[in-house]
């Protein structure tokens, strides 16, 4: 099965089992807008809780806020979004399709890396145990030629982005012979910049209304509340402010399911530090955030850092944590050193003093900021991609199972009476009542037990508890484990402790060493 076929199966699975639906589907949907179903919203909330608790609950110097989506329009002038929040877009004249020019080049660069790795793998198979990978990379003419070409284009690309040279960006696309995936032609328009902010009107009449924006990021709500939080919370630098909230971007090229959407949710933390210490903290947060991802157990090799070729107008350092999706390595989280740009700019535009008096140094200054920003929807897709598993079983049977970390699973326990009589449903319902105050539990009596197991596998439920005839005799139930399908007899009164041990966030938090 190709990665593209796997991704299509994953998207279909999300809809079939109540994770993600196309929005407004009865009206044929709305491009790049999706709704989360009954299982999707539970998974999403669990991801958010894992982030919030690890960020706020486990750090004494980080607190949370919930800022409004609508903000004074001057906020976005000060932040630079009105003038500089753009994407470089290019159209193919034959297919009439529009693409991000920078993404086309990034994908070409990634293909060169893939070519090199294929050459290395072929050589590894050819030479066997005697293969010296480092020497081969240095001496192979084909690898050297591809690497040199890649490095040359990468430098031109980085220079073009930093100089905002749209003509050079188009020329790179031409020189690399990048073709439209739809038409197969290289008949490109000029590259143009498009602002990504949604605007609307606030006011009772159109004549008296003022233009405001749907926020394109949640960070600015934190910055404008810096002094409110610092003073009321008596916070001392270094400290952080965290927020989870919706943001909106008029993405011209929205694709890959929920990976890139026009309405999305962010989990951001802005960490305020003394000027001159920001790079140390930036490196510290890089390590903390990578550990957070790897604690989920999806394989360390599926994550990597990717430093930015072009820094945003507010940053002096930036890197992404990328995950190996079915469509390749893509960003799930960014860690940025934002300097004092945001607070300094808001101080300038508002005319209000936004500074911190440091009792340790006896001086006042505008703090520097280190940001961690993760997309909830991308994280959701990462978890789904990693968890989705197709297994061939003995006897020619097969199953689809979502191997979520138990703490993130939408449903923790399914309670199943073996038959719908003989008092088994009543006992099963009592078990549900015992567990439901602490865990998301479902009761299911429809179809055979085997079919019910498969249904729970498909939504990622870690435990299936079956009430049978023996339960009525000795108070034990059959517990089936999702990943291994192994079964064991457990006393009803021991169920809570068993579920707690496997499904608690503590198992994840202990791996973070916070």
Predicted regions and their residues:
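NTP/phosphate- and nucleic-acid-binding module
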Residues: 1-514
């Amino acid at each position: 099965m190709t990665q593209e076929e796997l991704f299509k199966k994953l998207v279909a699975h999300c809809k079939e089992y109540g994770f993600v639906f196309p929005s407004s589907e009865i009206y044929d949907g709305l491009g790049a807008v999706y709704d989360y179903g009954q299982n999707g919203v539970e998974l999403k909330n669990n991801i958010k809780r894992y982030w919030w608790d690890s960020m706020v609950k486990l750090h004494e110097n980080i607190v949370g806020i919930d800022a409004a989506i609508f903000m004074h329009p001057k906020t976005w002038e000060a932040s630079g979004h009105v003038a500089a929040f753009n994407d470089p877009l290019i159209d193919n004249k034959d297919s009439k399709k529009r693409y991000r020019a920078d993404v086309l080049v990034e994908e070409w660069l990634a293909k060169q890396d893939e070519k090199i790795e294929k050459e290395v793998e072929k050589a590894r198979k050819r030479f066997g145990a005697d293969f010296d990978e480092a020497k081969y990379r240095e001496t192979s003419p084909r690898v050297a030629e591809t690497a040199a070409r890649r490095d040359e284009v990468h430098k031109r690309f980085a220079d073009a982005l930093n100089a905002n040279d749209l003509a050079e960006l188009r020329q790179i696309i031409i020189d690399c012979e990048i073709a439209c995936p739809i038409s197969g032609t290289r008949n490109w328009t000029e590259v143009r910049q498009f602002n990504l902010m949604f605007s609307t009107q606030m006011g009772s009449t159109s004549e008296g209304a003022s233009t405001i924006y749907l926020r394109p990021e949640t960070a600015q709500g934190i910055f404008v509340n810096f002094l409110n939080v610092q003073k009321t919370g008596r916070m001392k630098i270094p400290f952080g402010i965290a927020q989870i909230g919706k943001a909106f971007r008029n993405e011209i090229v929205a694709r890959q399911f929920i990976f890139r959407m026009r309405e999305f949710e962010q989990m951001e933390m802005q960490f305020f530090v003394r000027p001159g210490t920001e790079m140390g903290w930036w490196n510290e947060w890089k390590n903390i955030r990578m550990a957070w991802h790897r604690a989920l157990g999806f394989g360390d090799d599926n994550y990597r850092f990717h430093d930015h070729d072009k820094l945003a107008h507010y940053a002096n350092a930036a890197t992404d944590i990328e995950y190996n999706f079915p469509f390749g390595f893509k960003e799930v989280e960014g860690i940025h050193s934002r300097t004092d740009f945001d607070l300094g700019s808001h101080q300038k535009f508002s005319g209000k003093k936004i500074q911190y008096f440091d009792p340790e140094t006896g001086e006042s200054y505008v703090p520097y900021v280190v940001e961690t920003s993760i997309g909830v929807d991308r994280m959701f897709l990462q978890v789904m991609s990693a968890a989705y598993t197709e297994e061939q079983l003995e006897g020619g049977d097969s199953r689809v199972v979502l191997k979520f970390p138990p703490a993130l699973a939408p449903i923790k326990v399914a309670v199943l009476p073996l038959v719908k009589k003989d008092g088994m449903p009543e006992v099963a319902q009592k078990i549900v009542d015992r567990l439901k105050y602490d865990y998301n539990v479902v009761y299911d009596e429809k179809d055979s037990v085997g079919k019910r197991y498969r249904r729970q596998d498909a939504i990622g439920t870690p435990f299936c508890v079956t009430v049978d005839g023996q339960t009525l005799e000795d108070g034990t139930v059959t517990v089936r484990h999702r990943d291994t399908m192994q079964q064991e007899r457990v006393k009803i009164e021991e169920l809570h402790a068993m579920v707690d041990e496997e499904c608690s966030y503590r198992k994840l938090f202990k791996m973070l060493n916070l």
